[in-house]
Design a protein with these regions (language model features):
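Accessory nucleic-acid engagement/destabilization modules that flank
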Residues: 1-164
Length: 165
């Protein structure tokens, strides 16, 4: 699986073929179905980033829908810096219980700990009135904002982007 640019990924117009488009861009053989709610939430997330004038280059090197089949685990968005942190962003199409968000991010940190890097975890929740953002610091869940995500993903440095398995 290869990393992609989020803007390019979200240019898929036909939601029914989004999964095939994603698999082609990422060179993924997984062929996992992508729900329409997931696509809409991803596009909402991207729209918020673009509204804050993010440079297109900072949308590069995202790993979308990475999964570990042996444990049935999927990560919505990862960005893995070679000499920096692992950024984990989970996307939710609606608000769920905060304890469930915290549990998921805690589990994700455990699975990502094999990278031996700092792990920065967020959950982006699309709501009827906009969005909510949460961060997990390894101890507790905190309400956050899109600016903190921007700060984390707009770092200079090389990222892993090829043959991520």
């Amino acid at each position: 699986m290869d990393a992609i640019n989020l803007y390019v990924l979200c240019q898929a117009i036909d939601l029914d073929n989004f999964g095939d488009y994603k698999d082609t861009l990422t060179k993924s053989g997984n062929r996992l179905a992508v729900k329409k709610e997931e696509i809409i939430t991803l596009k909402s997330f991207l729209s918020e980033l673009l509204s804050r004038k993010i440079q297109m280059s900072y949308l590069d090197n995202f790993i979308y829908g990475f999964s570990i089949p042996q444990i049935s685990k999927e990560f919505d968005l990862l960005k893995i810096y070679e000499n920096g942190p692992v950024i984990n962003i989970e996307l939710k199409s609606r608000m769920i219980d905060e304890k469930k968000i915290e549990y998921q991010l805690k589990k994700n940190q455990y699975y990502l700990s094999h990278f031996k890097k700092e792990i920065i975890s967020f959950t982006y929740v699309m709501t009827e009135t906009g969005s909510k953002v949460f961060s997990y610091d390894g101890v507790s869940l905190k309400e956050s904002n899109i600016s903190e995500i921007l700060f984390s993903i707009c770092q200079d440095g090389e990222c892993y982007h090829k043959d991520i398995e």
